[in-house]
């Protein structure tokens, strides 16, 4: 029986990242940046107001409002016995204004947030520090040089790296790329994943199952798991186990996908037909892996391009767990990720856990956090391993997989275990 780590290593060796492509930044979210994005211009590109108010020379308003009683006189204003200054307002500069004006000594210009500052202005008075006047403004408090001013290049200077290679592009990175004027960016594309299910008992959810028939769960669930892993998914759906039809469909998918997943090809009536067809397309190895659920599984590289192809159990829970442990890391490696596995934390068990002897367990669980101590706690879901691997409802409730080491058949309440986050937590 092969260990989980040995099987993962064999699969990882087959990972090939598709050639990077250049895409519009609106399409880059969730992908890994494949270049160092170097800025060509400063951001912001000019000195601008950081708040609605009045652009002034800081020297003209120095001391106004100080408790020390410093009085400042202006040629166009009077001091009314308090530390208050009146300045003439020489117009308004709106955000987006393209004509630069020049501020004269002892003057103010009303500005909007984001508006370019007039020449010589080095501070902005917020409206709350004034009386809000339109032609003349009473200054109630002075401002030092640089107050409420965004200087050109404060955020990014020419030659700075805005987004580094290897960064997963999210909303903030898309915004930064737009801010520095990049329309397109080089990324590692999503690997194309084809998902199909084999089994004479399967019927699509659009039809009513007859006696002995069950809905096709796997092609839908595994396609969703592929999208969660950031693959570009083609859900083929139910495929006949007729050798001719099966061979044509699989061969067609090998020509258009970087990864192929077939559920239902490792046991039961369909197994022999599936393996016979796949053996004509390349090398497919079906082995027992020391894990539970999903011990029996297959992996090979098929077609002229050696496309990584997986055979997963027909049991939906087992299929999803094998996808999580074996298929997902390959997809993440193909995206260019250096650390393709889910985040692992240590958690204290809230109930006893039973695993299968001699196998590494991946058991469904509910992870929570103690509000006082911050400690992770985990509640195992489902019953005994042999009787609960088919219970899809408990997997839908789970937000983690409890990883039970090989040889640890019994875990007592209060013991510490490793827990892998699932989709809701990253």
UniProtKB/Swiss-Prot annotation:
SUPFAM superfamilies: MoeA C-terminal domain-like, MoeA N-terminal region -like, Molybdenum cofactor biosynthesis proteins. Binds 1 Mg(2+) ion per subunit. It catalyses: adenylyl-molybdopterin + molybdate = Mo-molybdopterin + AMP + H(+). GO terms for cellular component: cytoplasm; cytosol; plasma membrane. GO terms for biological process: Mo-molybdopterin cofactor biosynthetic process. Its EC number is 2.10.1.1. The keyword Transferase applies. Its cofactor is Mg(2+). Keywords: Magnesium, Metal-binding, Molybdenum, Molybdenum cofactor biosynthesis, Transferase. Gene3D superfamilies: MoaB/Mog-like domain (3.40.980.10), MoeA, C-terminal, domain IV (2.40.340.10), Molybdopterin biosynthesis moea protein, domain 2 (3.90.105.10), Molybdopterin biosynthesis moea protein, domain 3 (2.170.190.11). Coiled coil: none annotated. InterPro entries: MoaB/Mog-like_dom_sf (IPR036425), MoaB/Mog_dom (IPR001453), MoeA-like (IPR038987), MoeA_C_domain_IV (IPR005111), MoeA_C_domain_IV_sf (IPR036688), MoeA_linker/N (IPR005110), MoeA_linker/N_sf (IPR036135). Catalyzes the insertion of molybdate into adenylated molybdopterin with the concomitant release of AMP. Belongs to the MoeA family. This is Molybdopterin molybdenumtransferase 1. It comes from Mycobacterium tuberculosis (strain ATCC 25618 / H37Rv).
């Amino acid at each position: 029986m092969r260990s989980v780590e040995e099987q993962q290593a064999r699969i990882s060796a087959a990972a090939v990242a598709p050639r990077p492509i250049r895409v519009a930044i609106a399409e880059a979210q969730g992908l890994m940046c494949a270049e160092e994005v170097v800025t060509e211009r400063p951001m912001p590109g000019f000195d601008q107001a950081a708040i609605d108010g009045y652009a002034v020379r800081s020297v003209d308003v120095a001391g106004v409002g100080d408790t020390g009683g410093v009085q400042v006189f202006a040629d166009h204003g009077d001091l009314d016995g308090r530390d208050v200054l009146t300045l003439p307002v020489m117009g308004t500069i709106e955000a987006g204004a393209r004509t630069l004006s020049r501020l004269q000594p002892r003057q103010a210009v009303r500005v909007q947030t984001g508006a370019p500052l007039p020449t010589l202005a080095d501070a902005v008075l917020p409206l709350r520090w004034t009386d809000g006047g339109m032609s003349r403004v009473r200054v109630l408090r002075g401002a030092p040089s640089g107050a409420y001013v965004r200087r050109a290049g404060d955020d990014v200077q020419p030659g700075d790296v805005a987004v580094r290679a290897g960064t997963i592009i999210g909303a903030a990175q898309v915004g930064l790329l737009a801010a520095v004027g990049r329309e397109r960016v080089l990324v590692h594309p999503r690997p194309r994943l084809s998902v199909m299910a084999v089994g004479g008992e399967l019927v699509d959810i659009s039809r009513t199952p007859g006696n002995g028939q069950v809905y096709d769960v796997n092609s839908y669930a595994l396609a969703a798991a592929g999208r969660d892993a950031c693959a570009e998914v083609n859900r083929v759906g139910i495929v006949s186990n007729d050798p001719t039809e099966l061979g044509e469909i699989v061969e067609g998918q090998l020509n258009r996908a970087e990864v192929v997943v077939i559920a239902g090809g490792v046991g039961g009536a369909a197994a022999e037909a599936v393996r016979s067809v796949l053996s004509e397309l390349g090398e497919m190895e079906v082995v027992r892996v020391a894990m539970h659920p999903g011990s029996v599984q297959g992996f090979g590289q098929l077609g002229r391009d050696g496309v990584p192809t997986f055979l997963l159990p027909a049991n939906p829970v087992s299929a999803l767990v094998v996808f999580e442990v074996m298929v997902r890391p390959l997809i993440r490696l193909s995206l260019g990720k250096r650390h393709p596995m889910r985040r692992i934390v240590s958690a204290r068990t809230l109930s006893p856990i039973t695993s299968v002897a001699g196998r590494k367990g991946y058991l469904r669980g509910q992870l929570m956090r103690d509000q006082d101590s911050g400690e992770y706690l985990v509640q195992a879901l489902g019953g005994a391993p042999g009787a609960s691997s088919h219970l899809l409802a408990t997997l839908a409730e789970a937000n983690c997989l409890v990883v039970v080491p090989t040889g640890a058949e019994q875990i007592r309440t209060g013991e510490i275990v490793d827990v892998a986050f699932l989709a809701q937590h990253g």
